[in-house]
């Protein structure tokens, strides 16, 4: 897992997530090819999702051939260390889709329980608009409404809001949102790893944890299927291509 080459495929999406595994943090990388195949790219064992460790991890993956020739979409939650590492390794202009589920749950966590279900529905309805401008206006209305209700919740919604609308801005939310608006693709992998290792309650060494996690990941990978929206992936490829062309012309 940690040594396999990745230059035998054409890559389009990178998903990143950190999960607690046997009291340690495991940061996992999952790639999606232009034809929709999912593949594990690697993992790193760390105490926290800090920028230095995550950047070194991403560079190592890139050195093994993980390159988005037509551009790359990166999907992650709001972890600042991971976010900063992605910008450092893949550039300031790489499009990042922040997980809408994490954003929604972070916002409602500031609200009284009696209001949380209502606000989950409001946020979900706003994000469901496939048009970027319509979704953005709906979310900005919710920001203004939240300022009257709970300033902390409003600030939480505003933080990184544009990155939760990346698929909308690229014009592919209706076609690809089901697969890439959240980090669910990679979180489901870790959930299955936990199922396979839940009975192991004693770890002699840190290396043993890494080996067990890697073995479980490889077992899970054998059951991978293509992403549901694989037939629409050319739309994302073209959108990323267009974005790169516009940016290169602007820089010329």
Where are these regions (language model features)?
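Short acidic, glycine/Ser/Thr-rich loop/turn "cap" segments at secondary-structure junctions
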Residues: 39-43, 66-70, 104, 120-127, ...
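A detector of single, family-specific signature residues
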Residues: 34, 45-54, 59-65, 90, ...
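Acidic/histidine-rich catalytic cores and adjacent linkers
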Residues: 125-252
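Conserved beta-strand -> loop -> alpha-helix junction used to position metal-binding or nucleic-acid-contacting
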Residues: 72-80, 85-124
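RNase H-like nuclease fold core
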Residues: 1-76, 80, 84-92, 160, ...
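A generic short alpha-helical patch detector that favors 3-5-residue windows
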Residues: 21, 46-50, 74, 96-99, ...
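Short helix/loop capping segments that flank catalytic or ligand/cofactor-binding pockets
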Residues: 23-24, 83-84, 109, 165-166, ...
């Amino acid at each position: 897992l940690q040594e396999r080459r990745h230059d035998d495929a054409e890559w389009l999406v990178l998903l990143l997530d950190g999960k607690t595994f046997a009291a340690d943090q495991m940061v996992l990388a999952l790639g999606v090819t232009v034809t929709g195949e999912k593949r594990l790219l690697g993992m790193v064992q760390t105490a926290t999702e800090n920028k230095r460790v995550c950047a070194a991890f991403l560079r190592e993956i890139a050195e093994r051939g993980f390159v988005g020739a037509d551009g790359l979409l990166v999907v992650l939650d709001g972890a600042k260390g991971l976010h900063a590492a992605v910008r450092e390794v893949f550039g300031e202009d790489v499009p990042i889709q922040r997980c809408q589920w994490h954003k929604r749950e972070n916002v409602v966590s500031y609200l009284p329980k009696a209001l949380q279900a209502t606000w989950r529905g409001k946020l979900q309805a706003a994000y469901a608009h496939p048009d970027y401008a319509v979704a953005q206006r709906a979310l900005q209305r919710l920001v203004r409404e939240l300022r009257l209700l709970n300033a902390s919740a409003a600030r939480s919604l505003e933080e990184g809001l544009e990155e939760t609308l990346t698929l909308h801005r690229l014009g592919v939310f209706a076609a690809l949102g089901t697969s890439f608006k959240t980090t669910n693709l990679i979180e489901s992998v870790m959930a299955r790893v936990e199922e396979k290792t839940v009975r192991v309650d004693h770890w002699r060494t840190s290396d043993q944890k890494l080996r067990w996690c890697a073995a479980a990941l490889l077992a899970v990978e054998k059951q991978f299927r293509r992403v549901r929206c694989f037939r629409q992936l050319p739309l994302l490829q073209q959108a990323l291509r267009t974005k790169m062309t516009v940016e290169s012309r602007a820089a010329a």
